[in-house]
Amino acid sequence: MEAADYEVLSVREQLFHDRVRECIISILLFATLYILCHIFLTRFKKPAEFTTVDDEDATVNKIALELCTFTLAVALGAVLLLPFSIISNEVLLSLPRNYYIQWLNGSLIHGLWNLVFLFSNLSLVFLMPFAYFFTESEGFAGSRKGVLGRVYETVVMLILLTLLVLGMVWVASAIVDNDKASRESLYDFWEYYLPYLYSCISFLGVLLLLVCTPLGLARMFSVTGKLLVKPRLLEDLEEQLNCSAFEEAALTRRICNPTSCWLPLDMELLHRQVLALQAQRVLLEKRRKASAWQRNLGYPLAMLCLLVLTGLSVLIVAVHILELLIDEAAMPRGMQDAALGQASFSKLGSFGAIIQVVLIFYLMVSSVVGFYSSPLFGSLRPRWHDTSMTQIIGNCVCLLVLSSALPVFSRTLGLTRFDLLGDFGRFNWLGNFYIVFLYNAAFAGLTTLCLVKTFTAAVRAELIRAFGLDRLPLPVSGFPRASRKKQHQ
């Protein structure tokens, strides 16, 4: 063989080795996410649904749980996609010729974006509908009972649903862009209609993030207050613990000896009062065991961090609104080649990239908190070892819709300069200036409104509790005469 043939062969071998390495890394990453999601879901599932007398129902629920685990792993991968890309770019900038990070390149990042897009489509369009129909199916009338009969019914229902959704997508695409849609045929399902369907789902997810994130940003203060020990300047914990113990003992005596009182007792009300006192005593014990810095510094520092992150998010969005009016390059767009390691995606360098990653995770957590805090989706909130299979499927679908829209959401708000890779940048509505501008303005306005309304009331209430003014019998200052008249009467 000549030297040129050896060079061609070595290039082909290198490409083959790179491809195998990318596949191994992708499999290891997804396997790790899958194991974590499986452990997470097993903590919320109902054990009774998997240990029933009917082995058929238990088998169906196990199969549906594995499909939900796959979907939740894809959702977690979509959340980590943009932060992982930003961090990879900064690592390649800092260590451009390091031998041990040669595996971290643009081809790997681009492949991960394509895999997340593919698995998101697969989960939303096929796997989750299959899991729902599979758990609700009983087999066709007259057919043999068993898992196989349920599979046949589920496949038929899934085919009918696919035809219905495909027809709706074709009609919608023809209405929106009739010239282009008229040239497409059913043979272009994978290249045109499926990305168009995912574009609609992503737009729905972005709108859902627009509603849930401001609500979640306002709720994060109260949620953090429940998790941390709040400072109380004027309180005696020992006195409160003794009072709570005495009240609990008195109620317990009433429950154990109902005949000692000549009035009829509401046992259900007494049990609720005992449970409330026990919960209050647990909180007081937690406050007593907390250290001084936890009681006095932990909660204020956490509130300060939340306020800084929220204010920084609103400030970045406000600056991005001005950039949209001045520079066309601020519009979100996609790129086909991941040019990593050439320039930082933040003007502040690595520090700015870290801030971008922190803000992306913070907004995602806030959107999940706002999603479960909303009255419309509050019934989907998972409960520890008490979540039905239908609720698990609904939670996985909603979390996948939110997480798959996170890269588009972050780029639309200008939280990062990292352009969307692969099919994520093919969404038609991303190029519409009015949609992007109104979205940024609505996010900034809603977030500011929720914070001003919630934070001021929360600060006022916490200051009153911190100084112990809520336990003082203060008279109503606005109506002194009216109160005196009522006392005389």
UniProtKB/Swiss-Prot annotation:
Residues 1-76 are annotated as: LCN1-binding. Disruption phenotype: Mice exhibit severely impaired development of all lymphoid lineages, compromised antibody responses to immunization, reduced cytotoxic T-cell killing activity and natural killer (NK) cell function, and resistance to cytomegalovirus infection. T-cells are predisposed to apoptosis and die in response to antigen-specific or homeostatic expansion signals. Impaired differentiation of hematopoietic stem cells into the lymphoid primed multipotent progenitor (LMPP) and common lymphoid progenitor populations that give rise to T-cells, B-cells, and NK cells. Residues 43-66, 136-154, 218-305, 372-388, 453-489 are cytoplasmic. The chain crosses the membrane at residues 22-42, 67-87, 115-135, 155-175, 197-217, 306-326, 351-371, 389-409, 432-452. It is found in: Cell membrane; Endoplasmic reticulum membrane. InterPro entries: LIMR, LMBR1-like_membr_prot. Disulfide bonds: none annotated. Residues 1-59 are annotated as: Interaction with LGB. Keywords: Cell membrane, Endocytosis, Endoplasmic reticulum, Membrane, Receptor, Transmembrane, Transmembrane helix, Wnt signaling pathway. Signal peptide: none annotated. Belongs to the LIMR family. The lineage of its organism: Eukaryota, Metazoa, Chordata, Craniata, Vertebrata. This is Protein LMBR1L. It comes from Mus musculus. It comes from the Eukaryota. GO terms for cellular component: endoplasmic reticulum membrane; plasma membrane. Highly expressed in the bone marrow, thymus, spleen and lymphocytes.
